[in-house]
Curated annotation (Swiss-Prot):
The gene is MYLK. It comes from Ovis aries. Keywords: Actin-binding, ATP-binding, Calcium, Calmodulin-binding, Cell projection, Cytoplasm, Cytoskeleton, Disulfide bond, Immunoglobulin domain, Kinase, Magnesium, Metal-binding, Nucleotide-binding, Phosphoprotein, Serine/threonine-protein kinase, Transferase. All isoforms including Telokin bind calmodulin. Interacts with SVIL. Interacts with CTTN; this interaction is reduced during thrombin-induced endothelial cell (EC) contraction but is promoted by the barrier-protective agonist sphingosine 1-phosphate (S1P) within lamellipodia. A complex made of ABL1, CTTN and MYLK regulates cortical actin-based cytoskeletal rearrangement critical to sphingosine 1-phosphate (S1P)-mediated endothelial cell (EC) barrier enhancement. Binds to NAA10/ARD1 and PTK2B/PYK2. Its cofactor is Mg(2+); Ca(2+). One of its GO terms (molecular function) is ATP binding. One of its GO terms (biological process) is tonic smooth muscle contraction. It is found in: Cytoplasm; Cell projection, Lamellipodium; Cleavage furrow; Cytoplasm, Cytoskeleton, Stress fiber. Residues 331-420 form the Ig-like C2-type domain. Residues 233-296 are annotated as: Calmodulin-binding. Residues 1-241 form the Protein kinase domain. The modification Phosphothreonine is found at T300. Disulfide bonds join C352-C404. This is Myosin light chain kinase, smooth muscle. Its EC number is 2.7.11.18.
Protein backbone atom coordinates (compact mmCIF):
# COMPACT_ATOMS: atom_id res chain seq x y z
CA UNK A 1 0.00 0.00 0.00
CA UNK A 2 1.05 3.60 -0.61
CA UNK A 3 0.66 5.74 2.50
CA UNK A 4 0.62 9.55 2.57
CA UNK A 5 1.88 11.34 5.67
CA UNK A 6 -0.87 13.88 6.43
CA UNK A 7 1.38 16.56 7.89
CA UNK A 8 4.04 16.65 5.17
CA UNK A 9 2.44 14.92 2.19
CA UNK A 10 5.40 12.55 2.00
CA UNK A 11 4.66 9.13 0.51
CA UNK A 12 5.66 5.92 2.29
CA UNK A 13 5.11 2.22 1.68
CA UNK A 14 2.87 0.33 4.08
CA UNK A 15 3.26 -3.34 4.85
CA UNK A 16 0.20 -4.80 6.56
CA UNK A 17 0.11 -8.00 8.59
CA UNK A 18 -2.71 -10.04 10.07
CA UNK A 19 -1.29 -11.70 13.19
CA UNK A 20 -3.84 -13.82 15.02
CA UNK A 21 -1.58 -15.96 17.18
CA UNK A 22 1.18 -15.10 19.64
CA UNK A 23 3.66 -16.92 17.39
CA UNK A 24 2.69 -14.83 14.35
CA UNK A 25 3.09 -11.62 16.34
CA UNK A 26 6.44 -12.72 17.74
CA UNK A 27 7.73 -13.49 14.23
CA UNK A 28 6.84 -9.99 13.05
CA UNK A 29 8.32 -8.39 16.16
CA UNK A 30 11.51 -10.34 15.54
CA UNK A 31 11.71 -8.85 12.05
CA UNK A 32 11.14 -5.41 13.55
CA UNK A 33 13.91 -5.94 16.09
CA UNK A 34 16.35 -7.07 13.39
CA UNK A 35 15.47 -4.17 11.09
CA UNK A 36 16.18 -1.75 13.92
CA UNK A 37 19.85 -2.78 13.66
CA UNK A 38 20.14 -2.36 9.91
CA UNK A 39 20.67 1.23 8.78
CA UNK A 40 22.68 1.34 5.57
CA UNK A 41 22.26 2.99 2.14
CA UNK A 42 21.96 -0.42 0.45
CA UNK A 43 19.22 -1.65 2.79
CA UNK A 44 15.62 -0.46 2.68
CA UNK A 45 14.65 1.54 5.77
CA UNK A 46 11.55 1.79 7.93
CA UNK A 47 10.25 4.83 9.80
CA UNK A 48 7.55 3.45 12.07
CA UNK A 49 5.31 0.57 13.06
CA UNK A 50 1.93 0.21 14.72
CA UNK A 51 0.12 -2.66 16.37
CA UNK A 52 -3.57 -2.91 17.13
CA UNK A 53 -5.14 -6.22 18.11
CA UNK A 54 -4.49 -8.61 15.19
CA UNK A 55 -3.17 -5.89 12.87
CA UNK A 56 0.45 -4.82 12.53
CA UNK A 57 1.60 -2.13 10.10
CA UNK A 58 5.15 -1.28 9.10
CA UNK A 59 5.81 2.11 7.45
CA UNK A 60 8.75 2.02 5.04
CA UNK A 61 10.59 4.16 2.54
CA UNK A 62 9.40 3.71 -1.04
CA UNK A 63 11.74 1.99 -3.47
CA UNK A 64 10.16 2.74 -6.82
CA UNK A 65 12.53 1.39 -9.47
CA UNK A 66 11.21 -2.18 -9.55
CA UNK A 67 13.08 -5.48 -9.33
CA UNK A 68 16.65 -5.48 -10.63
CA UNK A 69 16.13 -8.37 -13.06
CA UNK A 70 13.00 -6.71 -14.46
CA UNK A 71 15.08 -3.60 -15.10
CA UNK A 72 17.74 -5.62 -16.89
CA UNK A 73 15.36 -7.12 -19.45
CA UNK A 74 13.84 -3.73 -20.28
CA UNK A 75 14.38 -2.80 -23.92
CA UNK A 76 15.99 0.53 -22.96
CA UNK A 77 18.60 -1.06 -20.70
CA UNK A 78 22.02 -2.13 -21.98
CA UNK A 79 23.47 -5.04 -20.01
CA UNK A 80 27.26 -5.24 -19.86
CA UNK A 81 29.67 -6.97 -17.51
CA UNK A 82 30.52 -3.51 -16.20
CA UNK A 83 26.91 -3.05 -15.07
CA UNK A 84 26.96 -6.50 -13.46
CA UNK A 85 30.02 -5.48 -11.43
CA UNK A 86 28.24 -2.33 -10.20
CA UNK A 87 25.26 -4.33 -9.00
CA UNK A 88 27.23 -7.16 -7.39
CA UNK A 89 29.41 -4.64 -5.57
CA UNK A 90 26.34 -2.97 -4.06
CA UNK A 91 24.85 -6.32 -3.06
CA UNK A 92 28.13 -7.29 -1.37
CA UNK A 93 28.30 -3.96 0.47
CA UNK A 94 24.78 -4.35 1.80
CA UNK A 95 25.27 -7.95 2.91
CA UNK A 96 28.65 -7.10 4.46
CA UNK A 97 26.89 -4.58 6.71
CA UNK A 98 24.19 -7.11 7.63
CA UNK A 99 26.82 -9.66 8.60
CA UNK A 100 28.77 -7.11 10.66
CA UNK A 101 25.64 -6.70 12.79
CA UNK A 102 25.68 -10.44 13.52
CA UNK A 103 22.71 -11.13 11.23
CA UNK A 104 22.15 -13.43 8.24
CA UNK A 105 19.55 -12.51 5.60
CA UNK A 106 18.68 -16.08 4.48
CA UNK A 107 16.45 -15.03 1.56
CA UNK A 108 18.72 -13.30 -0.94
CA UNK A 109 17.18 -13.63 -4.41
CA UNK A 110 16.40 -11.37 -7.40
CA UNK A 111 12.97 -10.36 -6.08
CA UNK A 112 14.64 -8.91 -2.99
CA UNK A 113 16.99 -6.64 -4.94
CA UNK A 114 15.16 -3.43 -5.84
CA UNK A 115 16.24 -0.46 -7.94
CA UNK A 116 15.99 2.87 -6.11
CA UNK A 117 14.52 4.57 -9.18
CA UNK A 118 13.77 3.81 -12.82
CA UNK A 119 16.85 5.47 -14.32
CA UNK A 120 19.88 5.07 -12.03
CA UNK A 121 21.94 2.03 -11.03
CA UNK A 122 21.52 2.23 -7.25
CA UNK A 123 19.86 -0.75 -5.57
CA UNK A 124 18.59 -1.70 -2.11
CA UNK A 125 18.09 -5.09 -0.48
CA UNK A 126 14.63 -5.74 0.93
CA UNK A 127 12.60 -8.36 2.82
CA UNK A 128 14.19 -9.32 6.12
CA UNK A 129 11.36 -11.61 7.18
CA UNK A 130 13.63 -14.67 7.31
CA UNK A 131 16.70 -12.91 8.75
CA UNK A 132 18.17 -14.36 11.93
CA UNK A 133 20.75 -13.32 14.50
CA UNK A 134 23.80 -15.55 14.43
CA UNK A 135 24.43 -15.43 18.15
CA UNK A 136 26.13 -18.80 18.57
CA UNK A 137 28.20 -19.52 15.48
CA UNK A 138 27.77 -23.07 14.25
CA UNK A 139 24.63 -23.82 16.27
CA UNK A 140 21.85 -22.28 14.16
CA UNK A 141 19.91 -24.53 11.78
CA UNK A 142 16.96 -23.43 9.64
CA UNK A 143 14.45 -25.08 7.33
CA UNK A 144 13.42 -22.19 5.11
CA UNK A 145 14.62 -20.26 2.08
CA UNK A 146 13.82 -20.23 -1.64
CA UNK A 147 14.77 -23.52 -3.35
CA UNK A 148 16.69 -22.07 -6.29
CA UNK A 149 18.84 -19.83 -4.07
CA UNK A 150 19.09 -21.76 -0.81
CA UNK A 151 22.45 -23.25 0.21
CA UNK A 152 23.08 -27.02 0.54
CA UNK A 153 23.52 -26.81 4.32
CA UNK A 154 19.96 -25.50 4.70
CA UNK A 155 18.45 -28.37 2.71
CA UNK A 156 20.51 -30.89 4.69
CA UNK A 157 19.55 -29.23 7.99
CA UNK A 158 23.15 -28.54 8.90
CA UNK A 159 24.52 -25.52 10.80
CA UNK A 160 24.38 -22.31 8.80
CA UNK A 161 26.59 -19.22 8.89
CA UNK A 162 27.29 -15.97 7.10
CA UNK A 163 28.56 -18.07 4.19
CA UNK A 164 25.00 -19.34 3.69
CA UNK A 165 24.17 -15.90 2.27
CA UNK A 166 27.32 -16.01 0.13
CA UNK A 167 26.05 -19.09 -1.72
CA UNK A 168 22.90 -17.15 -2.63
CA UNK A 169 25.02 -14.25 -3.87
CA UNK A 170 26.88 -16.71 -6.09
CA UNK A 171 23.63 -17.99 -7.61
CA UNK A 172 22.40 -14.43 -8.22
CA UNK A 173 25.69 -13.51 -9.92
CA UNK A 174 25.63 -16.64 -12.12
CA UNK A 175 22.15 -15.71 -13.36
CA UNK A 176 22.97 -12.02 -13.71
CA UNK A 177 25.90 -12.51 -16.10
CA UNK A 178 24.45 -15.41 -18.10
CA UNK A 179 20.65 -15.39 -17.87
CA UNK A 180 20.89 -19.06 -16.85
CA UNK A 181 20.10 -20.66 -13.50
CA UNK A 182 22.69 -23.13 -12.17
CA UNK A 183 20.17 -25.20 -10.19
CA UNK A 184 16.57 -24.54 -11.33
CA UNK A 185 14.70 -27.77 -12.04
CA UNK A 186 11.19 -28.47 -13.32
CA UNK A 187 9.86 -28.55 -9.75
CA UNK A 188 10.99 -27.86 -6.18
CA UNK A 189 12.22 -31.40 -5.50
CA UNK A 190 14.37 -31.40 -8.63
CA UNK A 191 15.77 -27.97 -7.79
CA UNK A 192 16.62 -29.02 -4.23
CA UNK A 193 18.32 -32.18 -5.52
CA UNK A 194 20.41 -30.07 -7.90
CA UNK A 195 21.47 -27.77 -5.06
CA UNK A 196 22.34 -30.70 -2.80
CA UNK A 197 24.60 -32.21 -5.44
CA UNK A 198 26.26 -28.79 -5.92
CA UNK A 199 27.19 -29.63 -9.51
CA UNK A 200 27.27 -26.77 -12.02
CA UNK A 201 29.53 -25.52 -14.81
CA UNK A 202 30.36 -22.71 -17.24
CA UNK A 203 29.94 -24.89 -20.33
CA UNK A 204 27.09 -22.94 -21.92
CA UNK A 205 28.03 -20.53 -24.70
CA UNK A 206 26.61 -17.73 -22.56
CA UNK A 207 29.88 -17.77 -20.62
CA UNK A 208 32.06 -17.41 -23.72
CA UNK A 209 31.79 -13.64 -23.42
CA UNK A 210 32.21 -13.52 -19.62
CA UNK A 211 35.62 -12.67 -18.14
CA UNK A 212 37.75 -15.18 -16.24
CA UNK A 213 37.62 -12.91 -13.18
CA UNK A 214 33.81 -13.10 -13.16
CA UNK A 215 33.92 -16.89 -13.40
CA UNK A 216 36.48 -17.06 -10.59
CA UNK A 217 34.26 -14.85 -8.43
CA UNK A 218 31.29 -17.18 -8.92
CA UNK A 219 33.42 -20.30 -8.45
CA UNK A 220 34.58 -19.09 -5.04
CA UNK A 221 31.01 -18.62 -3.86
CA UNK A 222 29.32 -21.77 -5.19
CA UNK A 223 31.39 -24.12 -3.05
CA UNK A 224 29.52 -26.89 -1.28
CA UNK A 225 31.78 -26.68 1.78
CA UNK A 226 30.55 -23.65 3.71
CA UNK A 227 34.07 -23.00 5.03
CA UNK A 228 35.53 -22.49 1.55
CA UNK A 229 33.30 -19.66 0.33
CA UNK A 230 34.41 -16.04 0.08
CA UNK A 231 33.02 -13.65 2.67
CA UNK A 232 31.72 -10.19 1.72
CA UNK A 233 34.97 -8.41 2.49
CA UNK A 234 36.86 -10.88 0.30
CA UNK A 235 34.26 -10.38 -2.44
CA UNK A 236 34.80 -6.63 -2.41
CA UNK A 237 38.57 -7.21 -2.62
CA UNK A 238 38.26 -9.76 -5.44
CA UNK A 239 39.85 -8.63 -8.75
CA UNK A 240 36.46 -8.70 -10.47
CA UNK A 241 34.72 -6.26 -8.09
CA UNK A 242 37.79 -4.23 -7.27
CA UNK A 243 38.67 -3.55 -10.93
CA UNK A 244 38.21 -0.04 -12.32
CA UNK A 245 35.15 -0.15 -14.55
CA UNK A 246 35.55 3.21 -16.31
CA UNK A 247 37.98 1.88 -18.89
CA UNK A 248 36.40 -1.57 -19.13
CA UNK A 249 35.11 -2.64 -22.53
CA UNK A 250 31.36 -2.07 -22.59
CA UNK A 251 30.49 -5.19 -24.55
CA UNK A 252 26.75 -5.86 -24.59
CA UNK A 253 25.59 -9.13 -23.07
CA UNK A 254 22.65 -10.97 -24.59
CA UNK A 255 19.40 -10.52 -22.68
CA UNK A 256 17.58 -13.27 -24.56
CA UNK A 257 18.38 -15.95 -21.97
CA UNK A 258 17.51 -13.63 -19.09
CA UNK A 259 14.09 -12.93 -20.64
CA UNK A 260 13.46 -16.68 -20.96
CA UNK A 261 14.59 -17.20 -17.37
CA UNK A 262 12.25 -14.50 -16.08
CA UNK A 263 9.34 -15.87 -18.11
CA UNK A 264 9.92 -19.37 -16.76
CA UNK A 265 10.23 -18.10 -13.19
CA UNK A 266 6.95 -16.21 -13.48
CA UNK A 267 5.23 -19.29 -14.86
CA UNK A 268 6.53 -21.44 -12.01
CA UNK A 269 5.42 -18.87 -9.44
CA UNK A 270 1.92 -18.97 -10.89
CA UNK A 271 1.88 -22.71 -10.30
CA UNK A 272 3.40 -22.39 -6.83
CA UNK A 273 6.45 -24.35 -7.98
CA UNK A 274 8.96 -21.71 -7.00
CA UNK A 275 8.22 -20.49 -3.50
CA UNK A 276 9.77 -20.04 -0.11
CA UNK A 277 10.40 -23.32 1.73
CA UNK A 278 8.29 -22.33 4.71
CA UNK A 279 8.36 -18.58 5.39
CA UNK A 280 8.09 -17.62 9.03
CA UNK A 281 6.36 -14.33 8.25
CA UNK A 282 4.23 -13.38 5.27
CA UNK A 283 6.20 -10.61 3.60
CA UNK A 284 5.16 -7.94 1.12
CA UNK A 285 7.50 -6.02 -1.20
CA UNK A 286 9.53 -4.05 1.32
CA UNK A 287 10.75 -4.49 4.89
CA UNK A 288 12.67 -2.65 7.56
CA UNK A 289 12.07 -0.71 10.76
CA UNK A 290 13.06 2.37 12.69
CA UNK A 291 10.00 3.31 14.66
CA UNK A 292 8.67 3.53 18.18
CA UNK A 293 7.39 1.16 20.81
CA UNK A 294 4.42 -0.81 19.67
CA UNK A 295 1.33 -0.97 21.82
CA UNK A 296 2.60 -4.24 23.27
CA UNK A 297 5.91 -2.76 24.33
CA UNK A 298 8.22 -4.44 21.84
CA UNK A 299 11.43 -2.36 21.66
CA UNK A 300 12.04 -0.11 18.67
CA UNK A 301 13.71 3.26 18.11
CA UNK A 302 12.19 6.53 19.39
CA UNK A 303 9.71 8.21 17.05
CA UNK A 304 10.34 11.67 15.63
CA UNK A 305 7.07 13.32 16.62
CA UNK A 306 7.27 15.79 13.74
CA UNK A 307 7.23 13.00 11.14
CA UNK A 308 3.87 11.52 11.95
CA UNK A 309 0.79 12.66 13.78
CA UNK A 310 -0.58 10.91 16.85
CA UNK A 311 -0.54 7.12 16.94
CA UNK A 312 -4.32 7.07 17.18
CA UNK A 313 -4.83 9.17 14.02
CA UNK A 314 -2.19 7.52 11.89
CA UNK A 315 -2.79 3.92 12.92
CA UNK A 316 -6.52 4.36 12.41
CA UNK A 317 -5.93 5.63 8.87
CA UNK A 318 -3.52 2.79 8.13
CA UNK A 319 -5.62 0.01 9.57
CA UNK A 320 -8.74 0.95 7.59
CA UNK A 321 -7.12 -0.72 4.58
CA UNK A 322 -6.73 -4.09 6.30
CA UNK A 323 -8.93 -6.85 4.86
CA UNK A 324 -11.97 -8.26 6.63
CA UNK A 325 -11.77 -11.43 8.73
CA UNK A 326 -11.44 -14.60 6.68
CA UNK A 327 -14.48 -16.88 6.30
CA UNK A 328 -14.34 -20.30 7.98
CA UNK A 329 -13.28 -23.03 5.56
CA UNK A 330 -12.86 -26.81 5.92
CA UNK A 331 -9.23 -27.96 5.42
CA UNK A 332 -8.08 -28.93 1.93
CA UNK A 333 -4.76 -29.32 0.12
CA UNK A 334 -3.98 -26.86 -2.68
CA UNK A 335 -0.75 -28.80 -3.15
CA UNK A 336 -0.35 -32.45 -2.16
CA UNK A 337 2.77 -34.42 -1.29
CA UNK A 338 4.28 -36.56 -4.04
CA UNK A 339 6.11 -39.89 -4.18
CA UNK A 340 9.85 -39.59 -3.64
CA UNK A 341 12.80 -41.80 -4.48
CA UNK A 342 16.03 -40.98 -2.64
CA UNK A 343 19.41 -42.56 -1.98
CA UNK A 344 20.20 -43.88 1.49
CA UNK A 345 22.07 -41.29 3.55
CA UNK A 346 20.57 -38.27 1.80
CA UNK A 347 17.66 -36.09 2.92
CA UNK A 348 14.02 -36.47 1.82
CA UNK A 349 11.42 -33.73 1.83
CA UNK A 350 7.64 -33.88 1.45
CA UNK A 351 5.97 -30.51 0.72
CA UNK A 352 2.30 -29.58 0.67
CA UNK A 353 0.15 -26.51 1.09
CA UNK A 354 -2.84 -26.55 3.42
CA UNK A 355 -5.80 -24.20 3.12
CA UNK A 356 -8.57 -23.66 5.64
CA UNK A 357 -9.72 -21.40 8.46
CA UNK A 358 -9.42 -21.55 11.42
CA UNK A 359 -5.84 -22.64 10.76
CA UNK A 360 -5.81 -26.44 10.68
CA UNK A 361 -3.77 -28.54 13.08
CA UNK A 362 -1.39 -30.88 11.26
CA UNK A 363 -0.20 -34.40 12.06
CA UNK A 364 2.21 -36.47 9.94
CA UNK A 365 2.12 -40.27 9.83
CA UNK A 366 4.65 -42.90 8.77
CA UNK A 367 2.44 -45.78 7.67
CA UNK A 368 -0.13 -45.69 10.51
CA UNK A 369 2.13 -44.31 13.23
CA UNK A 370 2.13 -40.59 14.06
CA UNK A 371 5.51 -38.90 13.69
CA UNK A 372 7.13 -37.01 16.53
CA UNK A 373 9.66 -34.31 15.75
CA UNK A 374 13.27 -35.32 16.33
CA UNK A 375 16.69 -34.86 14.78
CA UNK A 376 15.60 -37.39 12.16
CA UNK A 377 12.11 -36.00 11.47
CA UNK A 378 11.62 -32.23 11.16
CA UNK A 379 8.13 -30.78 10.67
CA UNK A 380 7.82 -27.24 9.33
CA UNK A 381 4.35 -25.67 9.22
CA UNK A 382 4.11 -21.99 8.34
CA UNK A 383 1.36 -19.40 8.61
CA UNK A 384 0.90 -19.21 4.83
CA UNK A 385 -0.12 -22.90 4.82
CA UNK A 386 3.11 -24.37 3.45
CA UNK A 387 3.94 -27.52 5.36
CA UNK A 388 6.96 -29.82 5.06
CA UNK A 389 8.26 -33.05 6.50
CA UNK A 390 12.05 -33.30 6.26
CA UNK A 391 13.73 -36.64 6.90
CA UNK A 392 17.47 -36.35 7.55
CA UNK A 393 20.01 -39.08 6.83
CA UNK A 394 17.46 -41.43 5.23
CA UNK A 395 17.87 -45.16 5.90
CA UNK A 396 16.13 -48.30 4.69
CA UNK A 397 13.68 -48.19 7.60
CA UNK A 398 12.29 -44.91 6.23
CA UNK A 399 10.94 -46.70 3.14
CA UNK A 400 7.21 -46.30 3.85
CA UNK A 401 3.99 -44.44 3.10
CA UNK A 402 3.72 -40.95 4.60
CA UNK A 403 0.48 -39.10 5.26
CA UNK A 404 -0.22 -35.48 6.15
CA UNK A 405 -3.49 -34.92 8.02
CA UNK A 406 -5.00 -31.44 8.50
CA UNK A 407 -7.86 -30.89 10.96
CA UNK A 408 -9.92 -27.91 12.09
CA UNK A 409 -13.38 -27.44 13.62
CA UNK A 410 -15.08 -27.91 10.23
CA UNK A 411 -13.47 -31.19 9.19
CA UNK A 412 -10.26 -32.83 8.03
CA UNK A 413 -8.24 -33.67 4.91
CA UNK A 414 -5.35 -36.03 4.16
CA UNK A 415 -2.83 -36.67 1.41
CA UNK A 416 -0.44 -39.61 1.12
CA UNK A 417 2.77 -40.37 -0.76
CA UNK A 418 5.42 -43.07 -0.76
CA UNK A 419 9.12 -42.78 0.01
CA UNK A 420 11.33 -45.27 -1.82
CA UNK A 421 14.85 -45.59 -0.42
CA UNK A 422 17.64 -46.87 -2.65
CA UNK A 423 20.16 -48.64 -0.43
CA UNK A 424 23.79 -48.42 -1.49
CA UNK A 425 25.89 -51.54 -1.70
CA UNK A 426 29.03 -51.60 0.44
CA UNK A 427 31.82 -49.72 -1.31
CA UNK A 428 29.48 -48.09 -3.80
CA UNK A 429 30.14 -44.40 -4.22
CA UNK A 430 33.70 -44.51 -2.83
CA UNK A 431 35.92 -42.23 -4.81
CA UNK A 432 32.93 -41.30 -6.93
CA UNK A 433 32.31 -37.85 -5.56
CA UNK A 434 32.29 -35.27 -8.27
CA UNK A 435 34.55 -32.33 -7.80
CA UNK A 436 32.64 -29.30 -6.63
CA UNK A 437 34.08 -27.14 -9.36
CA UNK A 438 36.90 -26.70 -11.77
Amino acid sequence: FRLVEKKTGKVWAGKFFKAYSAKEKENIRQEISIMNCLHHPKLVQCVDAFEEKANIVMVLEIVSGGELFERIIDEDFELTERECIKYMKQISEGVEYIHKQGIVHLDLKPENIMCVNKTGTRIKLIDFGLARRLENAGSLKVLFGTPEFVAPEVINYEPIGYATDMWSIGVICYILVSGLSPFMGDNDNETLANVTSATWDFDDEAFDEISDDAKDFISNLLKKDIKNRLNCTQCLQHPWLXXXTKNMEAKKLSKHRMKKYMARRKWQKTGNAVRAIGRLSSMAMISGLSGRKSSTGSPTSPLNAEKLESEEDVSQAFLEAVAEEKPHVKPYFSKTIRDLEVVEGSAARFDCKIEGYPDPEVVWFKDDQSIRESRHFQIDYQEDGNCSLIISDVCGDDDAKYTCKAVNSLGEATCTAELIVETMEEGEGEGGEEEEEE
